[in-house]
């Protein structure tokens, strides 16, 4: 489970512990790019409008972050997820050599980094469960961008559970049991 911008592994651990399926272990990688003004770490930095696509420099940081996470992953099946930037990294991991080991995705308050690439690859990959959560009042990742992301999976025929809520850029704890249930289904699918 990967944290968002300005997050840390330690900040992600409590949520991950609540969501982990029985018999599974938790890994919360930590991004390596220090946030210059707000503390914590980022998987990539950008100075332009967050609604716009990433520039080449930010995309390079994404690729470097993914490479670092890949080095930390254990052997065996994986449920990959995260919040905000961390979930975007999780989704992008479908473009890597470990994609066959991913049995489910947990995408919380996020958008896709490379929508065209995701559209291109998903039809050729074995579908797996995706649980998606996004807030209607999200001021950092607008709901429309979150919907664009999850619709790419739906359009490719992947099984998706949508958990939309009326709050902002956050995990809605009122939907925690539904989220846990979907993650348990992922674990039970192997």
What do the predicted segments below correspond to?
Residues 74-82:
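Alpha/beta-hydrolase fold nucleophile elbow
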Residues 38-44, 110-130:
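Flexible "cap/lid" loop of the alpha/beta hydrolase fold
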Residues 144-190:
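C-terminal catalytic histidine-bearing segment of alpha/beta-hydrolase fold enzymes
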Residues 82-86, 90:
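Gly/Ala-rich beta-loop-alpha elbow adjacent to hydrolase catalytic centers
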Residues 100-112:
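A conserved short beta-strand
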């Amino acid at each position: 489970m990967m944290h968002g911008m300005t997050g840390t592994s330690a900040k992600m651990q409590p949520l991950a512990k609540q969501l982990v399926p029985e018999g599974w272990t938790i890994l919360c990688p930590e991004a390596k790019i220090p946030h210059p003004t707000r503390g914590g770490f980022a998987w990539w930095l950008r100075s332009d409008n967050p609604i716009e696509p990433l520039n080449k420099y930010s995309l390079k940081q994404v690729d470097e972050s993914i490479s670092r996470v890949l080095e930390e992953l254990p052997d065996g099946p994986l449920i990959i997820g995260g919040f905000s930037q961390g979930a975007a990294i999780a989704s992008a991991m479908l473009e890597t050599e470990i994609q066959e080991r991913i049995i489910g995705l947990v995408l919380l308050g996020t958008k896709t980094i490379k929508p065209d690439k995701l559209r291109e690859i998903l039809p050729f990959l074995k579908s797996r469960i995706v649980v998606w959560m996004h807030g209607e009042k999200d001021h950092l990742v607008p709901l429309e961008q979150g919907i664009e992301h999850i619709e790419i999976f739906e359009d490719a025929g992947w099984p998706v559970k949508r958990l939309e809520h009326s709050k902002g850029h956050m995990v809605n704890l009122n939907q925690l049991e539904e989220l846990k249930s979907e993650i348990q289904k992922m674990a039970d699918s192997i």
